[in-house]
């Protein structure tokens, strides 16, 4: 669908700077903290933007088509300003924050738009969208592995950032021209700042959000640092670093398969079942992945399995919220959910580098398994509630 393609293109902005951290470090002599903040600043900007949108019910009061198109365009400008003005570390972090803020107007509204087109197959629909977002998030790693316009096979960081900005501009055009609202759109909601409080106090929605938080504890730290785990492993074994970059793209991008398959299965078997299995598999991978550091081939295979499982459940937490919450405020509920999840990622993304310095790559990811355990407990508790019958046409 056109919307999925547009989200894929726009979300290439997310890791555009993170993918080229080695080149930026060589150019600007980045510290370890600055390297982490190249990703964390986007997360923080997204959180602030999502909370702003949730408080004002923006996703339920403004045309989502135009919200996505305008947000993607401004995000592209902010991202492109980094190479155009050779911004340096401090200004780049500010521009990355702004990019994240604008992506809050792309991701949650996109899920709401899909929900207007889907009912019985909503899990699959949102799964396809999140799969496209996953592949889009991986695109900078692919661009960074393509030896075009580069020195000794390494592309200039400016090329990667400018290309992703161009992709986001194309996304805005696609949404503005081709995307339409579906037949299941609820009436425009009146402004109600108290809706956030009602959502947080509604136990079924709260448990779905708890499951999402367990998932997010793991996801973005895995996406941010697994490519560098692979790079370190490949270098230690004398393998091609370009191969490591391609593997990094594959590990993130393959999550698209997990999202689509999990969406298809969740509509037939239930959201709580599929999310629990996905969390269990990904948590297990987090526990053992470091043990394969000295075997890059096996490490790559395990990381690909992890890449499928770690994001397979993501769309189903969001779908559950659309089924459990007041239909007039679906956009606000999704924005609130994502803001809480991305706020949590700030902790785990920043946590991995010092853990790796302390225990090495072999044990640096074990802490990520805490999230899946918490998530499984939350989803099993949700499954036991009567309201769970509202999900997946009664399949819970």
Task: Describe each region flagged by the PLM.
Residues 50-88, 266:
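Conserved MFS/SLC helix-loop-helix module at the cytosolic interface between two early adjacent transmembrane helices
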Residues 78, 90-105, 297-312:
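Hydrophobic core of transmembrane alpha-helices in multi-pass small-molecule transporters
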Residues 266-317:
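C-terminal transmembrane helical hairpin of 12-TM major facilitator-type secondary transporters
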Residues 105-118, 312-326:
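Intracellular juxtamembrane helix-capping segments at the cytosolic ends
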Residues 17-18, 204-256, 318, 348-349:
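Extracytoplasmic gate region of multi-pass secondary transporters
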């Amino acid at each position: 669908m056109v919307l999925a393609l547009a989200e894929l293109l726009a979300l290439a902005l997310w890791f555009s700077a993170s993918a080229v951290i080695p080149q930026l470090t060589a150019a600007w002599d980045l510290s370890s903290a600055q390297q982490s903040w190249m990703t964390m600043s986007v997360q923080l900007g997204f959180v602030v933007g999502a909370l702003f949108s949730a408080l004002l019910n923006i996703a339920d009061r403004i045309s989502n088509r135009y919200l996505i198109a305008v947000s993607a365009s401004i995000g592209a400008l902010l991202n492109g300003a980094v190479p155009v003005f050779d911004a340096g570390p401090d200004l780049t972090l500010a521009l990355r924050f702004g990019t994240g803020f604008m992506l809050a107007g792309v991701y949650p509204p996109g899920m709401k738009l899909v929900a207007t087109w889907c009912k019985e197959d909503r899990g699959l629909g949102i799964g396809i969208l999140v799969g496209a977002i996953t592949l889009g998030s991986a695109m900078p790693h692919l661009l960074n592995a393509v030896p075009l316009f580069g020195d000794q096979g390494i592309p200039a960081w400016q090329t990667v950032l400018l290309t992703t900005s161009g992709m986001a501009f194309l996304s805005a055009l696609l949404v503005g021209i081709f995307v339409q609202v579906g037949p299941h759109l609820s009436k425009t909601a009146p402004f109600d700042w108290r809706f956030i409080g009602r959502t947080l106090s509604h136990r079924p929605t709260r448990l779905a959000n708890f499951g999402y938080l367990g998932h997010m504890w793991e996801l973005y730290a895995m996406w941010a640092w697994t490519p560098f785990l692979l790079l370190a492993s490949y270098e230690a074994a004398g393998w091609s670093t370009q191969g490591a970059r391609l593997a990094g793209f594959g590990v993130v991008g393959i999550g698209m398969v997990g999202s689509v398959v999990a969406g298809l299965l969740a509509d037939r078997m239930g959201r709580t079942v599929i999310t629990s299995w996905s969390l269990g598999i990904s948590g297990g991978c987090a526990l053992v992945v470091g043990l394969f550091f000295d075997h890059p081939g096996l490490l790559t295979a395990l990381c690909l399995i992890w890449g499928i499982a770690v994001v397979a459940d993501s769309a189903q937490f969001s779908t559950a919220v659309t089924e459990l919450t007041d239909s007039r405020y679906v956009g606000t509920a999704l924005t609130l959910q994502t803001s809480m999840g991305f706020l949590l990622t700030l902790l785990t993304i920043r946590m991995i580098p010092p853990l790796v310095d302390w225990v090495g790559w072999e044990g640096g990811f074990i802490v990520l398994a805490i999230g899946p355990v918490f998530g499984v407990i939350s989803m099993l508790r949700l499954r036991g509630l009567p309201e769970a019958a509202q999900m997946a046409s009664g399949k819970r």
